[in-house]
């Protein structure tokens, strides 16, 4: 509120109308209230010190300019936080007692006429959780003097007459016409803006379905994006699983390749040993025993290599132990059957020889053994048929037939019969069919003695040492047959070994 500002409004307090006038003078606030009906007047003048002390006592300090601005806003009713009220002295005391917590109306005390005629203009400042009252005391001035009023009326009339003589009314008419013209322009602009607003509203209402369609399209695209993300995640998981399976299959194939290489190496070693044994004849019993020891050592090495290959091919410990156990059983049976089946025919010697007796117990045991071996053969055949891998089937076929060594004739005619060491080694390394092995591995007497394979078996260590007749035709014929059979077996081994090497080469090319 600036100096020289005068604010005047008509307000209604407790059912009565009052004219409120607030004037800002030099460092002074003047408040004047007059009753519209009775013309009673109340007037008060307040300085900055009084106003600031009053606000400090209420607990909410305000500076003098701020208080004047608050009072102006209350007169104009431009703010809801400040209002005005007009109270008498008794009403003010009642308000104070209510704030102090006194219940009931206080006793009426004798009051002076000045206090009873005094009025209090209350400036009420309302904050969020509190209301502060600033009371301004206004002493009673009484009714206005009629002479003064008439004097004021005359002054106003003269002022009006002076303004009329100066032609101010014409100027005011021009200003009125100008204002009316501006008003018409503003109305035209308003109508144009209203029409533009209507058009915009119509366009907005028409484009609403398009916007809704765009929202639906965006929503559907988001759903498709989520579906594609889920689908890509599932496909990635599936691809990773397939990759893991392929890696496992690759490891299995590499292990199978290593096992096959070990098998090829063992078969190559076996073939070399067979060829070396075929080229080296058995000269004597002592030499045969030494060769037997050497071949037994090579057989032990070959057996260890074969077992290593079996371990590499199969991941089952129980199958390895079962195969080792069956192999050892077959080796022992082959050795025992070889020693039992080597029954020599007596040569025409003048001294004569003892005829072997028929042993029924050995015959029954031999027949039971043959039955068990036939059952084992059928079980192995079923197991081989169930295997789907060609490498396993090839290994099963390569194991099922082993070469039968050729029996070599000794150089000296006076030495005793010796069983072929190569036949014993082939029995130890064979894991195929026992019945086929027995047909191929029937030992021949190097001195022309004929074995009785279908006859009764003789216990180990009861061989009759006789001087064989080297000129016997049957011996030469059997030796030729044995050479032909051994050659055929070696050819078959070579063919199978070549097929296995071709398969290994195909595996290497496939990787």
Swiss-Prot record:
The keyword Coiled coil applies. Keywords: Cell projection, Cilium biogenesis/degradation, Coiled coil, Cytoplasm, Cytoskeleton. Residues 1-144 are annotated as: Head domain. CDD domains: HD_CCDC61_N. InterPro entries: CCDC61_N (IPR049733). Transmembrane segments: none annotated. The keyword Nucleus does not apply. GO terms for molecular function: identical protein binding. Residues 306-403, 447-486 are annotated as: Disordered. GO terms for cellular component: centriolar satellite; centriolar subdistal appendage; centrosome; ciliary basal body; cytoplasm; microtubule organizing center. Residues 315-335, 366-378 have a biased composition (Basic and acidic residues). Its main location: cytoplasm. Residues 147-272 form a coiled coil. Belongs to the CCDC61 family. Forms homodimers (via head domain). The N-terminal 3D structure (head domain) resembles that of NHEJ1/XLF, PAXX, SASS6 and XRCC4. PANTHER family: CENTROSOMAL PROTEIN CCDC61, YEAST SPT2-RELATED. The coiled-coil domain is involved in microtubule-binding. This is Centrosomal protein CCDC61. It comes from Danio rerio.
């Amino acid at each position: 509120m600036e100096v020289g500002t005068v604010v005047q409004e008509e307000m209604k307090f407790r059912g009565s109308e009052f004219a409120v006038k607030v004037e800002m003078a030099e460092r002074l606030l003047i408040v004047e209230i007059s009753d519209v009906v009775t013309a009673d007047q109340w007037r008060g003048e307040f300085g900055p010190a009084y106003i600031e002390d009053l606000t400090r006592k209420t607990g909410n300090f305000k500076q003098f300019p701020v208080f004047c601005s608050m009072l102006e806003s209350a007169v104009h009713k431009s703010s809801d936080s400040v209002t005005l009220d007009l109270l008498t002295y008794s009403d003010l005391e009642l308000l104070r007692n209510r704030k102090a917590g006194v219940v009931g109306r206080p006793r009426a005390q004798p009051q002076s006429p000045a206090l009873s005629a005094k009025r209090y203009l209350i400036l009420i400042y309302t904050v969020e959780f509190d209301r502060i009252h600033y009371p301004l005391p206004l002493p009673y001035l009484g009714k206005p003097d009629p002479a003064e009023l008439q004097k004021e009326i005359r002054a106003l009339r003269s002022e009006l007459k002076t303004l009329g003589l100066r032609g101010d009314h014409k100027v005011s008419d021009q200003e009125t016409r100008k204002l009316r013209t501006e008003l018409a322009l503003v109305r035209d602009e308003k109508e144009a803006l209203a029409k533009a607003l209507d058009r915009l509203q119509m366009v907005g209402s028409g484009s609403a379905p398009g916007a809704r369609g765009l929202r639906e399209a965006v929503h559907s695209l988001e759903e498709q994006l989520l579906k594609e993300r889920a689908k890509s995640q599932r496909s990635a998981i599936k691809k990773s699983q397939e990759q893991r399976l392929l890696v496992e299959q690759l490891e299995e194939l590499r292990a199978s390749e290593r096992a096959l290489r070990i098998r090829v190496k063992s078969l190559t070693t076996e073939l070399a040993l067979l060829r070396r044994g075929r080229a080296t004849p058995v000269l004597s019993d002592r030499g045969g025993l030494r060769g037997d020891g050497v071949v037994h050592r090579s057989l032990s090495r070959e057996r260890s290599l074969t077992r290593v290959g079996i371990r590499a091919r199969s991941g089952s410990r129980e199958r390895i132990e079962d195969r080792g156990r069956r192999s050892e059983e077959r080796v022992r049976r082959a050795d025992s059957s070889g020693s039992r089946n080597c029954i020599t025919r007596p040569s025409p010697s003048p001294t004569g020889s003892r005829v072997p007796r028929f042993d029924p117990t050995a015959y029954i045991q031999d027949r039971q053994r043959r039955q068990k071996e036939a059952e084992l053969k059928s079980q192995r055949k079923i197991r081989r048929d169930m295997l789907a891998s060609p490498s396993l089937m090839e290994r099963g076929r390569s194991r099922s037939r082993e070469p039968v060594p050729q029996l070599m004739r000794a150089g000296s005619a006076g030495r005793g019969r010796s069983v072929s060491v190569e036949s014993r080694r082939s029995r130890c390394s064979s894991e195929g069919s026992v019945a086929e092995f027995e047909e191929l591995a029937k030992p021949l007497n190097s001195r022309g003695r004929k074995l009785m394979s279908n006859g009764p078996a003789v216990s180990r260590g009861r061989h009759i040492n006789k001087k064989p007749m080297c000129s016997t035709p049957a011996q030469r014929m059997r030796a030729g047959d044995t050479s032909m059979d051994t050659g055929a077996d070696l050819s078959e081994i070579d063919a199978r070994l070549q097929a296995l090497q071709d398969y290994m080469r195909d595996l290497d090319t496939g990787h």
